[in-house]
Amino acid sequence: MKNTGKRIDLIANRKPQSQRVLYELRDRLKRNQFILNDTNPDIVISIGGDGMLLSAFHKYENQLDKVRFIGLHTGHLGFYTDYRDFELDKLVTNLQLDTGARVSYPVLNVKVFLENGEVKIFRALNEASIRRSDRTMVADIVINGVPFERFRGDGLTVSTPTGSTAYNKSLGGAVLHPTIEALQLTEIASLNNRVYRTLGSSIIVPKKDKIELIPTRNDYHTISVDNSVYSFRNIERIEYQIDHHKIHFVATPSHTSFWNRVKDAFIGEVDE
C-alpha cells in the first residue's frame, strides 16, 4: 500500500480509556500507511477531553499555520469533539479522503509588560484571566487607547469566540460565534456600590481593537492562560488582541458546527 504522506501526531491523556484508544488508533494509522510524527505533523489528534485539546494547541502554538487539529473524545461529550472513541474507522476513512480543507477559529494574543522591561507573550485558545491573590484587584481598563473605567473586584477575563462557551459563560458572558472575530472582556465579581462603579456587563471588542489592563498596585497577580497559571509581580500593563494566527481544524463531514457544539454541550436533545 502506498504511503499517504500525511504526518500525524497523537496526544492523549493518561486515563485508561484514552490510552486504549491511543494504541488502537496508532495501529490503524500505521496499517493504513500514515506517518506518525510528533515534531512536525500535518494533523494533530487529541485524545481525551477539551483539556487535552488545549494541551495539544499549546504544544503546537508556534506551528499554527502548518498544523490542523482533530478532537477525539473519550469521555462525556466535549465542546471540541469531532469524533467519539467508537468512531475510529470513520476517522481513518475521513483522513484518507482528506483534501486539506480546514475550519479556522480566532486565537487570543496576550502580552504582559513588566516594570523591569521584560515582556511575556502568550497565546490562548479559550481565555486569559487575571486575579489578585489575596485582596480586591484594582485595574484601569483602556480600550483602543481610550481610558474606559477603573475596575475593582476579584478579576477580569478576556475570551475568544470559542472560549466564550467556557469560563466566560459561567461568569454570565455572551456566547459568541467564531466567525465574529472579536474578544470578550468579562468581569469576575466586580465591586459596585455608591462609591465604586463598573459597567457590570461583558464588552465585545472588534478584531482591530486592543484591550489594555493596567493594575494600580505592584504586588503579585495571578494570570491564567487556558489551563496554565502564572504569577507575576510589578506588572506595568497587559495587552490583549486577536492573534495574527488562527487555530485550524480538519474540515471533514464529521467536523461539528459551532451551534451544534453549543447545543450538545449545554442543552442536549430538545423535547418536542
UniProtKB/Swiss-Prot annotation:
Its main localization is cytoplasm
UniProt-listed Enzyme Commission number(s): 2.7.1.23
Essential cofactor(s):
a divalent metal cation
According to its UniProt record, this protein's enzyme class is: transferase
Its domain of life? Bacteria
- Write out the catalytic residues in the record: D50
A GO biological process held by the record: NAD metabolic process
Cellular component GO terms, alphabetically? cytoplasm
Q: Sorted alphabetically, which HAMAP family does this protein's record hold?
A: NAD_kinase
Q: What is this protein called?
A: NAD kinase
- Source organism: Streptococcus pneumoniae serotype 4 (strain ATCC BAA-334 / TIGR4)
